[in-house]
């Protein structure tokens, strides 16, 4: 029997969803501590209204997590669900971590030491209100702001992690009440995509080498309430929450062309689950997963030439549990583990990714997270 709770549409759109520490300058590579004894790290943010922190969990070779520290962002969160994906981002070298501060309307950057611990570089205005999602390609950073009329805004990042606004980069979304969830660069850094829950559309922007963007071109979503998404090469997989209707959510796949047009490959492949909101690809691109907030489950799809097919007829590839409300997903760089943040469970669950794409729950996740914890990265 499927476990689900029907989310009111307003709740889905909103949440399917301490004192500052002074900024510290980044360390040079020679000042970094020795390599970590762990396989890697997993990061999330508290989204705390009194002061936001990035939480570090060290990742062992068996996928298990142990607390590794907390790091003030210099900004504040909201203390509540944000209805977003990708509130944290790593640059391609893994040297810098960025996070949004939805309460103070800022972006923070950190230097990532070799052991995964963080040094705050600084925090800067996001170019709008209530930043929800951040993305980076090379030295170009973009954020989508969900407050007010909503907009995107771009920045260059220096070799020391300092952000500078790109003139003219603050561009509108498709409407003044679009309900953005995520922004992300295409793998080549020339296209930006924003999902808009309230307008059932995707806004697409073209990005010049200097970081300036043009757009949006508005593409109707195949299904209602497009939410999270992930790229693998030219293939884009987007979750569709369908307003939180029971067992009605889906995922669509698109091919992203160089001119920014999106061509549907598979339209609205059902999850048979409730409120599919977050998406992650396996490292090899053969599988895609959605976190189904209303069902407490994860749905897996095989991906062949961009076409989606359910791994399990009932749509249940992994089970987090009743009331767990899984939201963000992250895959370890070695492709061995999928991590899921549960907003209801206040925990991070760990699943082994098997060769056939199936998931096996493994012990050793993280527990006792604060309400409102948001975002997930694996390094």
Predicted ranges, named:
Residues 13-37:
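Bacterial Sec-dependent N-terminal signal peptides
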Residues 44, 99, 143, 194, ...:
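Residue position within the beta-strands of beta-propeller blades
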Residues 47-49, 59, 102, 112, ...:
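Short loop/turn segments immediately following the C-termini of beta-strands
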Residues 57-64, 110-117, 156-163, 205-212, ...:
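Short loop/turn segments immediately following beta-strands, especially the blade-tip
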Residues 67-79, 119-125, 167-173, 214-220, ...:
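A short beta-strand motif characteristic of beta-propeller blades
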Residues 74-93, 126-140, 172-191, 221-242, ...:
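Beta-rich, blade/repeat-based domains predominating
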Residues 118-182:
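Asp-box/WD-like beta-propeller blade repeats and closely related beta-sheet repeat scaffolds
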Residues 343-379:
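Blade-level signature of beta-propeller repeat domains, shared across WD40, Kelch, NHL, RCC1
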């Amino acid at each position: 029997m499927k476990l689900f709770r029907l989310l009111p549409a307003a709740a889905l759109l909103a949440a399917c969803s301490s004192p500052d520490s002074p900024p510290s300058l980044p360390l040079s590579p020679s000042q970094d501590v020795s390599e970590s004894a762990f396989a890697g790290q997993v990061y999330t943010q508290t989204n705390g209204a009194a002061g936001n922190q990035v939480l570090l969990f060290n990742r062992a070779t068996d996928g298990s997590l142990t607390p590794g520290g907390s790091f003030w962002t210099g900004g504040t969160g909201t203390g509540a669900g944000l209805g977003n994906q990708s509130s944290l981002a790593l640059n391609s070298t893994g040297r810098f971590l960025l996070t949004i501060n939805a309460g103070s309307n800022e972006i923070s950057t950190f230097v990532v030491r070799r052991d995964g611990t963080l040094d705050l570089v600084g925090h800067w205005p996001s170019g709008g209100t209530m930043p929800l999602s951040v993305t980076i390609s090379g030295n170009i950073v973009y954020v989508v702001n969900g407050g007010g009329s909503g907009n995107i805004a771009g920045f260059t990042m220096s070799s020391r992690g300092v952000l500078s606004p790109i003139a003219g980069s603050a561009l509108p979304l498709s409407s003044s009440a679009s309900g953005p969830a995520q922004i992300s660069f295409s793998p080549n850094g020339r296209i930006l995509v924003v999902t808009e829950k309230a307008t059932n559309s995707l806004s697409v922007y073209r990005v010049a080498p200097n970081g300036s963007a043009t757009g949006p071109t508005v593409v109707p979503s195949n299904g209602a309430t497009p939410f999270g998404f992930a790229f693998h090469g030219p293939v884009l997989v987007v979750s569709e929450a369908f307003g939180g209707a029971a067992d009605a959510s889906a995922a669509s796949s698109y091919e992203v062309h160089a001119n920014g047009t999106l061509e549907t490959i598979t339209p609205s492949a059902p999850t048979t689950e409730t409120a599919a909101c977050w998406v992650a690809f396996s490292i090899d691109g053969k599988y895609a997963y959605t976190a189904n907030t209303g069902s407490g489950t994860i749905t897996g799809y095989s991906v062949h030439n961009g076409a989606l097919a359910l791994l399990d007829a009932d749509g249940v590839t992994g089970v987090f549990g009743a009331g767990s409300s899984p939201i963000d997903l992250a895959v370890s760089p070695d492709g061995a583990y999928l991590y899921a943040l549960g907003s209801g469970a206040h925990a991070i669950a760990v699943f082994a990714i098997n060769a056939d794409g199936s998931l096996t729950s493994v012990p050793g996740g993280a527990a006792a997270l604060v309400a409102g914890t948001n975002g997930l990265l694996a390094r």
